[in-house]
UniProtKB/Swiss-Prot annotation:
Keywords: GTPase activation, Mitochondrion, Transit peptide. The gene is ARHGAP11B. GO terms for biological process: cerebral cortex development; glutamine catabolic process; negative regulation of mitochondrial membrane permeability; regulation of small GTPase mediated signal transduction; signal transduction. The keyword Transit peptide applies. Residues 49-250 form the Rho-GAP domain. When expressed in embryonic mouse neocortex, promotes basal progenitor generation and self-renewal, and can increase cortical plate area and induce gyrification. Mice exhibit increased neocortical size and upper-layer neuron numbers persisting into adulthood. Moreover, mice display altered neurobehaviour, characterized by an increased memory flexibility and a reduced anxiety level. ARHGAP11B arose from partial duplication of ARHGAP11A on the human lineage after separation from the chimpanzee lineage, but before the divergence from Neandertals. It comes from Homo sapiens. This is Inactive Rho GTPase-activating protein 11B. The record marks 87 as: Arginine finger.
Length: 267
């Protein structure tokens, strides 16, 4: 049984030594459990609510996933052939009414237009109190984009090992769903690149002029902001990597674990 704190420390050291990526202030699972105490205050709301305070459904192979996400993806699977799914906007009025019904516990997704469900799904991620790809990893993820293709992919997947387990479960489930959408791109015109363009700003919750980099990074002149407009290609490419390698999320290379054990034994 590996000591999770030791694994995390080794990952941070490995990222810094081999890729020049420094990660600071990453919050662990225990810190995120504070959201559970808010469950009683939230009531039945779905939007703007932390994952841990939402109703969950057990999904084989993925674990416990927010029930709304499961219901939305299941409903959209029936319309996966729809051209422009996620790209075409639904009715603003219908979307607002649909969101209100969902927040009041009404099971209405099965009868809603697919474009409305798709719009609601994007809004769900966009309104999370914290982005599913946490802000304290944004700088490191952006730094990884400067690496060569193979090294970049390895670095991004190693960074995924710093995510909380429940976050990884949701990402694996959702990225597998998006993969299924992309497999029908001959009909829906939504390949993995198009999906990455659409979901990157929702998963990262980035916006123009939003979120300053650390003062350390500013001094080095690496980047001044994490604005969506300026770094759109980087964010889209990063989401594309996660989409293509969703099965490998939070799976630490065994060779790295052996190095961890050797380091522990030599202490």
């Amino acid at each position: 049984m590996w000591d999770q704190r030791l694994v995390k420390l080794a990952l941070l050291q490995h990222l810094r030594a081999f890729y020049g990526i420094k990660v600071k202030g990453v919050r662990g699972q225990c810190d995120r459990r504070r959201h559970e105490t808010a469950a009683t205050e939230i009531g039945g709301k779905i939007f703007g609510v932390p994952f841990n305070a939402l109703p969950h459904s057990a999904v084989p192979e993925y674990g416990h996933i927010p029930s709304f996400l499961v219901d939305a993806c299941t409903s959209l699977e029936e319309h996966i052939h729809t051209e422009g799914l996620f790209r075409k906007s639904g009715s603003v009025i219908r979307l607002k009414a649909l969101k209100n019904k969902v927040d009041h516990g009404e099971g209405c997704l099965s009868s809603a237009p697919p474009c409305d469900i798709a719009g609601l799904l994007k809004q769900f991620f966009r309104e999370l109190p914290e982005p599913i790809l946490p802000a304290d990893l944004h700088e490191a993820l952006l730094k990884a984009q400067q690496l060569g293709t193979e090294e970049k992919n390895k670095a991004i997947l190693l960074l995924s090992c710093l995510l909380a387990d429940h976050t990884v479960h949701v990402l694996r489930y959702f990225f597998n769903f998006l993969r299924n959408v992309s497999l029908r791109s001959s009909e829906n015109k939504m390949d993995s690149s198009n999906l990455a363009v659409i979901f990157a700003p929702n998963l990262l919750q980035t916006s123009e002029g939003h979120e300053k980099m650390s003062s350390n990074a500013e001094k080095k002149g690496v980047y001044q902001t994490l604005s969506w407009k300026r770094y759109q290609p980087c964010w889209v490419l990063m989401v594309s990597v996660l989409l293509h390698h969703w099965k490998a999320l939070k799976k630490v290379n065994m060779k790295l674990l052996v190095n961890i054990r050797e380091r522990e034994d030599n202490v």
